[in-house]
């Protein structure tokens, strides 16, 4: 019986970690006043009939605080990458041979507030994912046969502590990202 309980906790923790990792990847793509490779890495590009992230088509670097450079390995992919960046980021990259430069304009106050609103929306979705994991684990604990009410109560308290830990982690990541977005 205890083994079943431990399995429920392991599974719940694994799923909560996944939710936090997914959240980290999602907010990494949110633009701040500093250039970051995460801004373009996951943008999908049409390449020989399939959608491929830019990071698989070239080397991405940040030579200056407001510039991203993509050294494309296959010259044929350059127009598709340029188009994808225009569409996804609404920016105009400059192309020199197989090198694509993306210069980021400074963020306006209005755009910063917009990004913070988006950050809050993404954060709430992440919290909901963690709470859904808790709900599923709670249902599994309550359905367990052969454990006392006290054991169930302790298990549910432990589950709540686990949930709080991951919600706190999400909140800390959000606060750091918000500070990053709002800094000039």
Swiss-Prot record:
Subcellular location: Cytoplasm
Matches recorded under Gene3D superfamilies: 3.30.1360.40, Ribosome-recycling factor
Molecular functions (GO terms): ribosomal large subunit binding
GO CC annotation terms, alphabetical: cytoplasm
Keywords: Cytoplasm, Protein biosynthesis
One of the protein's GO biological processes: translational termination
Main location: cytoplasm
Entry-linked CDD domains: RRF (cd00520)
Functional note: Responsible for the release of ribosomes from messenger RNA at the termination of protein biosynthesis. May increase the efficiency of translation by recycling ribosomes from one round of translation to another.
Similarity annotation: Belongs to the RRF family.
Protein name listed in UniProt: Ribosome-recycling factor
Source organism of this protein record: Aquifex aeolicus (strain VF5)
Gene: frr
């Amino acid at each position: 019986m205890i083994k079943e309980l431990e399995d429920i906790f392991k599974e719940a923790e694994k799923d909560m970690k996944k939710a936090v990792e997914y959240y980290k990847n999602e907010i990494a793509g949110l633009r701040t006043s500093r250039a970051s490779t995460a801004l373009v890495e996951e943008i999908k590009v049409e390449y020989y009939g399939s959608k491929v992230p830019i990071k698989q088509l070239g080397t991405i670097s940040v030579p200056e605080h407001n510039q991203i450079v993509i050294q494309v390995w296959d010259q044929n992919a350059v127009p598709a990458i340029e188009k994808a960046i225009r569409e996804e980021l609404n920016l105009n990259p400059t192309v020199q041979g197989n090198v694509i430069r993306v210069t980021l304009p400074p963020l306006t106050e209005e755009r910063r507030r917009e990004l913070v609103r988006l950050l809050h929306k993404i954060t709430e979705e992440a919290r909901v994912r963690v709470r859904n994991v808790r709900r599923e684990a709670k249902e599994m604990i309550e359905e367990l046969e052969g454990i006392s009410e006290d054991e169930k109560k302790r298990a549910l308290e432990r589950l709540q502590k686990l949930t709080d830990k991951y919600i706190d982690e999400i909140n800390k990541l959000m606060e750091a990202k918000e500070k990053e977005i709002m800094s000039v």
